[in-house]
Swiss-Prot record:
Residues 265-388 are annotated as: P domain, projecting. InterPro entries: Capsid_prot_S-dom_vir (IPR000937), Coat_P (IPR055068), Viral_coat (IPR029053). Pfam families: Coat_P, Viral_coat. Homomultimer. The keyword RNA-binding applies. GO terms for molecular function: RNA binding; structural molecule activity. It comes from Tomato bushy stunt virus (strain Cherry) (TBSV). Residues 103-264 are annotated as: S domain, virion shell. Residues 1-102 are annotated as: R domain, interaction with RNA. It is found in: Virion. Belongs to the icosahedral plant coat protein family. Capsid protein self-assembles to form an icosahedral capsid with a T=3 symmetry, about 32-35 nm in diameter, and consisting of 180 capsid proteins. This is Capsid protein. PROSITE patterns: ICOSAH_VIR_COAT_S (PS00555).
Length: 388
């Protein structure tokens, strides 16, 4: 007689053995699901307990033989020096997006500067004066972005990330620190005590990478047109790079900056030419455009101190009495140059140079130096200034 099951009707439906097994499996799965649902925590605790027992058994096995290796060194989060470490750098393609008329969002990564080690505590290569203020028109921080930002009135940073990439061996001693200060006019930290008090800070060995994510907000600020008296009102803040504890002043790494910034309200293009003028007493009377360099003078030396890296064309003239002598210091290399001396009255110069790291200084030595006018702009080596 065949096995049957009864339905709502009075008719009988024959069921095979295969169908009966399927029905039993479905019922068993439903029951198991309910058991796991009601006893899930107990099952997890049992599995953890079983794992602990197995781990202890492995440690006890072999008597007093050492099963684990203990390393003397750091606490949790410490990084052991590898034999070698490297990083492959891939080019970044800028992205432009815009959802509303009159604005554009720019996303890109730029090279900021080479980092040199130092024995004592040093910030931004020893250059003081709020070097890396976070503003799209700050030519000392950005080399590519100002050409676009100069066409807009306001900005909002959506994200900013500093990335330190080492280029030294793992035997290099010292420390590299990158930090963010919300006040763009605060003086640079004077020592390690002040540095340690920054809330947004990353420190690392020269051979280890580090990334610093800068906190941003949604506030619209004005782009720096060099006529602002209070930079706190227009800057998101300022960045800083500190080094200390090294054995020398060799290059140890590079700093890159990645950002996403939204620019608002197109305007006539702002100047990208830096102009600095000194009066007869040597006082600064004109400072317009990006702060690529600082200009100062004594009666015998005209000094131009760079505040940014890259390739520049410098042109200028100054009153003096005798022929001039060129002087270079730091990571500056002259690509082409023309100097014209008008003995007894003044001298003029045109220099195409590349600055690889800070500090870098160009000087002219003469006598009777008084007033001076110096222009500086980013360029390429093809902008040859030599006289044919």
């Amino acid at each position: 007689m065949a096995m049957v099951k009864r339905n709502n009707n009075t008719g009988m439906i024959p069921v095979s053995t295969k169908q009966l097994l399927a029905l039993g499996a479905a019922a068993g799965a439903t029951a198991l699901q309910g058991f796991v649902k009601n006893n899930g925590m107990a099952i997890v605790e049992g599995a953890v307990d079983l794992t602990k027992r197995a781990y202890k058994a492995v440690r006890r096995r072999g008597g007093k033989k050492q099963q684990m290796i203990n390393h003397v060194g750091g606490t949790g989060g410490a990084i052991m020096a590898p034999v070698a470490v490297t990083r492959q750098l891939v080019g970044s393609k800028p992205k432009f997006t815009g959802r509303t008329s009159g604005s554009v969002t720019v996303t890109h990564r730029e090279y900021l500067s080479q980092v040199n080690n130092s024995t004592g505590f040093q910030v931004n290569g020893g250059i003081v004066g709020n070097l890396l203020q976070l503003n799209p028109l700050n030519g000392t921080l950005f080399s590519w972005l100002p050409a676009i930002a100069s066409n807009f009135d306001q900005y909002t940073f959506n994200s900013v990330v500093l990335h330190y990439v080492p280029l030294c061996s793992t035997t290099e001693v010292g420390r590299v620190a990158i930090y963010f200060d919300k006040d763009s006019e605060d003086p640079e930290p004077a020592d390690r005590v002040e540095l340690a008090n920054y809330s947004v800070l990353k420190e690392t060995a020269p051979w280890a990478e580090a990334m610093l994510r800068v906190p941003t907000d949604k506030i619209k600020r004005f782009c720096d047109d060099s006529s602002t008296s209070d930079h706190k009102l227009i800057d998101l803040g300022q960045l800083g790079i500190a080094t200390y504890g090294g054995a020398g002043t060799n290059a140890v790494g590079d700093i890159f900056i990645s950002y996403s910034v939204t620019l608002y309200f197109p305007q006539p293009t702002n100047t990208l030419l830096s102009t600095r003028r000194l009066d007869l007493a040597g006082a600064l009377v004109t400072a317009s455009g990006p702060g690529y360099l600082l200009v100062s003078r004594t009666a015998t030396v005209l000094t131009m101190t760079f505040r940014a890296t890259g390739t520049f064309v410098i042109s200028g003239t100054y009153r003096c009495l005798t022929a001039t002598t060129l002087g270079l210091a730091g990571g500056v290399n002259v690509n082409s140059i023309t100097v014209v001396d008008n003995i007894g009255t003044d001298s003029a110069f045109f220099i195409n140079c590349t600055v690889s790291n800070l500090p870098s200084v160009v000087t002219f030595t003469s006598t009777g130096i008084t007033s001076a006018t110096v222009h500086c702009v980013r360029a390429t080596r093809q902008n040859d200034v030599s006289l044919i």
